[in-house]
Amino acid sequence: MFADNQMISGRQCARLLFFDFLGIGTLLLPGYLADVAGEDGIFAIAFGVAASLLYLKLLQKIVLGREETFLSGAGGGIAKAADGLLIALYGLYYVLLGGYALYLFGTLIQRTLLVEESFWLITLLGLVLAVYGMARGMESRARVYEVLFWLVLIPFLLMLLLAVADVSPQQQFPMATAAPGDVLQGAYLVFLVFSLCQMLLFAGNVISPEKAGRAAGSAILFAGLLFAVLYEILLGVFGRVTVSELEFPAVSLMSMVTLPGGFLHRQDALMVGVWFFTLFALICSSMYYSCQCMEKFRGKSVLWRGIPVKKWILLLCG
């Protein structure tokens, strides 16, 4: 039996954050990095990871330095008003983030699996599922993704391993040719993905700040390593120009990898499941934390009263 205390462990927190990073990062980063940094994209990833870890340390100091939770609105007067404004901005940020993740979710499913179906129908069904998942609470979602972690990750790693056979090392070189500004621009893009670790500001009600900080750090390092491996494989298989032109390079890579035995002809359809679960996790997280921000202004019952409004907001954003 599981304890129903709405608390999550450090491992569960790390896996939830990893899923949030993995979906949007593997879909978008390779093309952007190839466009701005080319063969030096690997350095941009390294710098982006380093900057994200420093940012995480700053967040930890902010959270640990407060006597109350970030959402409690400690203090009064100007301080309380500033807190309220900041939380409102974070709430808007999570609404927009959830809307964009929902857009990616619908676009990917339609273009790879359900070509004949309506984009709006796909996103609406995904949104209904996300609302249900969010309403079940953080602890329930954490349990689900703890179980799904290796079920999703092992096929992804297997496909990367099989893709190594098609890598042409000459397409990964020469390195150290991009302008420093281009590498820094790429690092900033990586940092934007990992800046999702700011969710720990609002996670004080489900996990201690110390555990959340360690979990976020491990998730950043693991995801950063995976981004680097994926990027180098994509460069070696497609080359810089092709990677920069493909809409979803990682999905294209999965579609061309052949499994031994040839018993599965549409393994790309199977691999879309990776992004189905990871983008779904990001949508649920965005909804959960935006509702946490709404609680600040409308009371605890907002988590339920805000759901119908949130559905329409996210749908419009998508």
Task: Annotate each predicted stretch with a short phrase.
Residues 25-119, 128:
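Membrane helical hairpin/interfacial module
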Residues 10-28, 44, 48, 52-55, ...:
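Hydrophobic, membrane-embedded alpha-helices of multi-pass small-molecule transporters
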Residues 102-120, 208-226, 286-316:
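Helix-loop-helix connectors at the membrane interface of multi-pass transporters/channels
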Residues 105, 120-121, 133-163:
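Membrane-interface loop-to-helix entry segments
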Residues 38-41, 67-68, 78-82, 205-213, ...:
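Juxtamembrane helix-boundary/capping and inter-helix hinge elements in multi-pass membrane proteins
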Residues 237-268:
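Membrane-interface interhelical connector segments
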Residues 78-89, 148-163, 222-229:
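Small-residue-rich segments of transmembrane alpha-helices in multi-pass membrane proteins
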Residues 1-8:
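Short, Lys/Arg-rich, polar N-terminal cytosolic tail immediately upstream
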